[in-house]
Each structure stands twice: as structure tokens, then as C-alpha cells.
Amino acid sequence: MSNPMRPVRSILLAIFTGCAGLIGYALYLQLVENLLPCPLCVVQRMAYWLIGLTALAGFFHTPETTGRRIYAGLMAVFAFTGGLVALRQAWLVRYPEAFECGISPEEAFLNALPLARWWPVMFEANGDCADVTWKFASLTLPDWSAIFFMILAALSIYVLLVRENQRE
């Protein structure tokens, strides 16, 4: 007997694993490569956390159609939000003159959140959003983040729309 939720559960586990890997790499860049996160980076980290934890909850809960769609819808909203933030940061990297110097209201707000006090290494913003110190294949970190958010959004929409009686 085939479990109709198995493909969906595999995707949810892959989404969680991908988000955990991206967060782990962000911490590596911060702690080993000394690349401080800016306010927009911290918001993207929060989005990756929200997507990953929602996927993990969906994986363990294995809900029926309505619950699966709620989990997938939340993941899609978090992915689109994170993607928009990543695109905004990519724009700031390309047009740094549009960025104001000094402490931004976003930085002050994020650093005042309980999350930043509870886990400052993960959620405290100290970097400059327009600073480019890392590139891979001619793409900056915000570019790659936007790509990963698009992939996560596409997977979330697939989970949202897939029929549960689909067989492997």
C-alpha cells in the first residue's frame, strides 16, 4: 500500500534540510569568514527559519489536504517575503548611493527584538547592506538568496497544488 503523502513529506524534509543548510552556511560566513549580517540579512535568516520550521512541522504532522495547504501556503508567503527582501538587498548592492549611512531604523528595530537578545549571533544586525565582500559565479550573497527563495517558493507552491492521491 502506497502512502499518498510520501512525495509531499520528502519535499517537506528537503525544504527543511535546505533551510538548515542555508542558515548553517550563513553562520559559517559570519563566524569563520567574519562577514557580519546586515538588517536585511537578518530578515532573510528569519524567513529561512520560518520556512524550515513550517516544513518540519508539516513533515511530522502529515496533515490532510487542508492542513497541507495551510503549511504550504505559509511557506510560500515566507519564501516570497524573503525573496522580496533579498531582491531589495541586491538592488542596494548595485545602487549603494541610494542607501543611507549610519544606523538604519531597521537595524535598531531588529536589534531590539527579543530574538536578537536571546540569540545575538543569529539575529543581531551589525553589517552594511550595501557592502559586497562575497561573490560566487559573479553573483552576490543577496542574489543567491533570492534564487534560493524562488526555489523554496516553487516547492511550496508544488506542495500546495499537488493532489494527495498522486502515486510515486
From Swiss-Prot:
Topology versus the membrane: Multi-pass membrane protein
Disulfide cross-links: 38-41, 101-129
GO cellular component: plasma membrane
Keywords: Cell inner membrane, Cell membrane, Chaperone, Disulfide bond, Electron transport, Membrane, Oxidoreductase, Redox-active center, Transmembrane, Transmembrane helix, Transport
Biological process (GO), any one: protein folding
Ranges annotated as spanning the membrane: 12-28, 47-63, 70-87, 144-162
Major site of localization recorded for this protein: membrane
Pfam families per record: DsbB
Location of the protein in the cell: Cell inner membrane
Residue ranges, Periplasmic side: 29-46, 88-143
Domain of life of the organism encoding this protein: Bacteria
InterPro entries the UniProt entry points to: DiS_bond_form_DsbB/BdbC (IPR003752), Disulphide_bond_form_DsbB (IPR022920), DsbB (IPR050183), DsbB-like_sf (IPR023380)
Record GO terms (molecular function): electron transfer activity; protein-disulfide reductase activity
Cytoplasmic side: 1-11, 64-69, 163-168
Coiled coil (UniProt feature): none
Function recorded in the entry: Required for disulfide bond formation in some periplasmic proteins. Acts by oxidizing the DsbA protein.
Family: Belongs to the DsbB family.
Protein name: Disulfide bond formation protein B
Organism, as annotated: Nitrosospira multiformis (strain ATCC 25196 / NCIMB 11849 / C 71)
Gene name, Swiss-Prot/TrEMBL: dsbB
